[in-house]
């Protein structure tokens, strides 16, 4: 059965499971979920006071009779809240699995749209069964429990360098752009309300300004859900996402300001100036609280090297503490948790272990994904109901003014900011920024938070906000991918940055900093260099411990290098390590080379067992984990070293073949079988023996395997053939046990089974044993997958009697 059949078999049980969960949700009493999300304290009060044993009366008995032990009981109110929350999370997770079973569906329709449609389906079922409005999501649940994980995930994994390089543009769009949209939409709607034919004359100016402030909030949840799939370039992504993240703080400040003005009977000039001061205090105060708690978290994790288990806990506790502390002082919780996450990513990551860091990433991605799914589902569920008021003029003009003022704001503000940017934003980038102004959960929660006593047309505001949210999420979210492809907007580069690229980038940063210093211009390179010096001198010494953990790959590499150094010291090789000062003293030595069969065997062993690199599939997704920088650098180091080893072995093999082809013992197929070469082609090489004698010999022999290929590979050309004997793993020349050289009258020895000759009294001894060459722990792994091969043949020197005939005439080619 093919993949389609397997997918069909997987979808059928999943469909039945979804139907079962839907039936469980419908079977829940009508007010159960409302008690969970709207009146949780009341539900807890009802379930936390169970009846006393004296008041429990079995069916069919009087209060004076003794009750018996029941066999089976059902106490749903006791577990109602956690049971329903678990069911909703399970339903949302299964819905996401079902979407991704159809691979083409998430590429056409964003996941946020699909989740809203699931919520609409559930809300319609609940409304049809109970004939009541489905429960709406409580705003405290959204702001205190569902929104912080999403903002924490976005701030922790945000690329910090592009964010700070575009910080001025982001603040320009977030602050000035939000004020532009809020005031523009509010004044335009107030002008529409003055037309008596529309029946909107009871909506005041402050109410329109309040509605304009909440409807102008670009939602980071919706932006992340859409822009993570289209893979625009990093600069454009940072601008849209940074604006959506920071303008929420501006929106909340304006919302609270206009809400307070609406509840006042008279507004004085002092109140206006207090509102402007409150605007800056809320934003700056939230950032300071986040940075302070981020520093405390880094200082705490400095002392957790003995208790690794609780390291991930501090990341989530301090980040959430920054959010609720800012909310407690009526500051910006979004700014606080974003600043805390970015601070912890810089310092805490270097204190925690690699396993703790992986746990943090997985758990953070899981929390943000679940929160985002629940938000979109409850947006769909809360849409169905009777709490709506429809007015064609107000709804249609609200949608039109949102699009018009968003486009005008982006194009006008970009013309101003391009004067100060090194790389100006193009028309395509401006169009995508204006097109990416998606509304979402922030606007939805704020409009439900309006008090009905102060705003009698609250239902009309809810209806208009839902229309704007659905239009931007569905229409703009679905069409933005083909629009990006049609405009040929620059996409993101998925290629991971190599170590050399990072080194060159840092080099260019220092060069640009020096140029700015010479010119007397204090740009962002100057301030970045100043902060780095301050960070290295004070902050890192205070917040980061000295022996911070490293990657497991780097640790293994370090252990291998230490083991290699110990083996060199034990075998006496460390004393003869050459230095650059002693390169001129190295004497060129001609040693015997290995046979081609032995070279092939060594190359096969090295390619199979030396530095086995674990491959990882890289993909860019918000809910997937990105590759760690230290892991990528260590992996690249090992890959380069493995490549260099193989290249050096390949080069040695090619040199061996060239030398064998140039010796007198080579057999030329163009000559007769027993014909000797001319004297001009016979090259005699003088080789000094241990006793000082020299003899003619060819260059067929053993191979030099460099135990430290790096030390030899980077030598200059004039010294590339010079190496100390301590670095060589070679076979010693034949050592005569009886005498220094066999007499000429010795008859040729009989050939062995392998095809070589065996000389009595002549031994071949390795300089290093097998354990010293490959290590005791590697012996089994090196020979596990390699088939056994015959040992290398023992060959006489060409100068010995009877040997040249055997090599030229009897030896197999």
From Swiss-Prot:
Compositionally biased, Polar residues: which spans? 687-696
Q: Which residues are glycosylated?
A: 351
> Where in the cell?
Apical cell membrane
Chief subcellular location: membrane
Task: Give the catalysed reaction(s), semicolon-separated.
Answer: Na(+)(in) + H(+)(out) = Na(+)(out) + H(+)(in)
Annotated membrane-spanning segments are 108-128, 139-159, 170-190, 210-230, 238-258, 279-299, 309-329, 362-382, 393-413, 431-451, 460-480
Q: Where is the composition biased (Basic and acidic residues)?
A: 649-661, 770-781, 797-813
> Region Disordered: what ranges?
649-709, 736-813
Inhibition and activation profile: Li(+) activates Na(+)/H(+) exchanger.
Listed Pfam families? Na_H_Exchanger, NEXCaM_BD
Described by its record, this protein's role is as follows: Plasma membrane Na(+)/H(+) antiporter. Mediates the electroneutral exchange of intracellular H(+) ions for extracellular Na(+). Major apical Na(+)/H(+) exchanger in the base of the colonic crypt. Controls in the colonic crypt intracellular pH (pHi) to direct colonic epithelial cell differentiation into the absorptive enterocyte lineage at the expense of the secretory lineage.
Listed under subunit, the entry gives: Interacts with CHP1 and CHP2.
User: According to its UniProt record, which protein family does this protein belong to?
Assistant: Belongs to the monovalent cation:proton antiporter 1 (CPA1) transporter (TC 2.A.36) family.
Q: What is this protein called?
A: Sodium/hydrogen exchanger 2
């Amino acid at each position: 059965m093919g993949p389609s059949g397997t997918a069909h078999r997987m979808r059928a049980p999943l469909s039945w499971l979804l139907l079962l969960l839907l039936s469980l949700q419908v079977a829940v009493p009508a007010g159960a979920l409302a008690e969970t999300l709207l009146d949780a304290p009341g539900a807890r009060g009802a379930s936390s006071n169970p009846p006393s044993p004296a008041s429990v009366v079995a069916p069919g008995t009087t209060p004076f009779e003794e009750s018996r032990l029941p066999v089976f009981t059902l106490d749903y109110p006791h577990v109602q809240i956690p049971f329903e929350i678990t069911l909703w999370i399970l339903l949302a997770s299964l819905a996401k699995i079902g979407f991704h079973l159809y691979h083409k569906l998430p590429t056409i329709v964003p996941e946020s749209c699909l989740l809203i449609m699931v919520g609409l389906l559930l809300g319609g079922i609940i409304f049809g069964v109970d004939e009541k409005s489905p429960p709406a999501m409580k705003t405290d649940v959204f702001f205190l429990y569902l929104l912080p994980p999403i903002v924490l995930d976005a701030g922790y994994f945000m690329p910090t360098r592009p964010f700070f390089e575009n910080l001025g543009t982001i603040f320009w769009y977030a602050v000035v752009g939000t004020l532009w949209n809020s005031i523009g939409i509010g004044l335009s709607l107030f002008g529409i309300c003055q037309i008596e034919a529309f029946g909107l004359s009871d909506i005041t100016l402050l109410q329109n300004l309040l509605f304009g402030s909440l409807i102008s909030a670009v939602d980071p949840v919706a932006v992340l859900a859409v822009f993570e799939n289209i893979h625009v370039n990093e600069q454009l992504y940072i601008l849209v996402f940074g604006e959506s993240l920071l303008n929420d703080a501006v929106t909340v400040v304006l919302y609270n300001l206009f809400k307070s003005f609406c509840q006042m009977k008279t507004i004085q000039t002092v109140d206006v100036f207090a509102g402007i001061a409150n605007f800056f205090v809320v934003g700056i105060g939230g950032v300071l609280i986040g940075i302070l708690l981020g520093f405390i978290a880094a200082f705490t994790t400095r002392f957790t090297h003995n208790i690794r288990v609780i390291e991930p806990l501090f990341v989530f506790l301090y980040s959430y503490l920054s959010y609720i502390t800012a909310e407690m002082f009526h500051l910006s919780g979004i700014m606080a948790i974003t600043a805390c996450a970015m601070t912890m990513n810089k310092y805490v990551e270097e204190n925690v272990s690699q396993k703790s860091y992986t746990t943090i990433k997985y758990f953070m991605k899981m929390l943000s994904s679940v929160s985002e799914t629940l938000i979109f589902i409850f947006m769909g569920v809360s849409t169905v109901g009777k709490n709506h008021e429809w007015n064609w003029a107000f709804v249609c003009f609200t949608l039109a003014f949102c699009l018009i003022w968003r486009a005008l704001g982006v194009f006008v503000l970009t013309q101003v900011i391009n004067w100060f940017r090194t790389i100006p934003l193009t028309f395509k980038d401006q169009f995508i920024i204006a097109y990416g102004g998606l509304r979402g959960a922030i606007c939805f929660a704020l409009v439900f938070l309006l008090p009905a006593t102060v705003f009698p047309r609250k239902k009309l505001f809810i209806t208009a906000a839902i229309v704007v949210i659905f239009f931007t999420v569905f229409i703009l979210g679905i069409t933005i991918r083909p629009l990006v492809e049609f405009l040929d907007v620059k996409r993101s580069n998925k290629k991971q940055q190599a170590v050399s690229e990072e080194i060159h980038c840092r080099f260019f940063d220092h060069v640009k900093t020096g140029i700015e210093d010479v010119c007397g211009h204090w740009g962002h390179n100057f301030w970045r260099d100043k902060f780095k010096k301050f960070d290295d001198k004070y902050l890192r010494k205070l917040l980061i411990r000295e022996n911070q953990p490293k990657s497991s790959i780097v640790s293994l590499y370090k252990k291998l290098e230490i083991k290699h150094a110990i083996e060199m010291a034990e075998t006496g090789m460390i004393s003869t390590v050459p230095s650059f000062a002693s390169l001129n003293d190295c004497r060129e030595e001609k040693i015997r080379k290995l046979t081609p069969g032995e070279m092939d065997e060594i190359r096969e062993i090295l390619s199979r067992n030396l530095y086995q690199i674990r491959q990882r599939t890289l993909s860019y997704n918000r809910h997937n984990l990105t590759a760690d920088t230290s892991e990528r650098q260590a992996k690249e180091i090992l890959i380069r070293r493995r490549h260099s080893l193989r290249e050096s072995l390949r080069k040695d093999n090619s040199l061996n073949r060239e030398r064998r082809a140039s010796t007198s013992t080579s057999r030329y197929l163009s000559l007769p079988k027993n014909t000797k070469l001319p004297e001009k082609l016979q090259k005699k090489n003088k080789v000094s023996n241990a006793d000082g004698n020299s003899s003619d010999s060819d260059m067929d022999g053993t191979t030099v395997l460099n135990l430290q290929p790096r030390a030899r590979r980077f030598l200059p050309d004039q010294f590339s053939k010079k190496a100390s004997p301590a670095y060589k793993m070679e076979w010693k020349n034949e050592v005569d046990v009886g005498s220094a050289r066999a007499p000429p009258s010795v008859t040729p020895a009989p050939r062995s089974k392998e095809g070589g000759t065996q000389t009595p009294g002549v031994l071949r001894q390795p300089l290093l044993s097998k354990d010293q060459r490959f290590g005791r722990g590697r012996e089994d792994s090196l020979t596990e997958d390699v088939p056994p091969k015959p040992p290398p043949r023992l060959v006489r020197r060409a100068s010995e009697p009877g040997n040249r005939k055997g090599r030229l005439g009897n030896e197999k080619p």
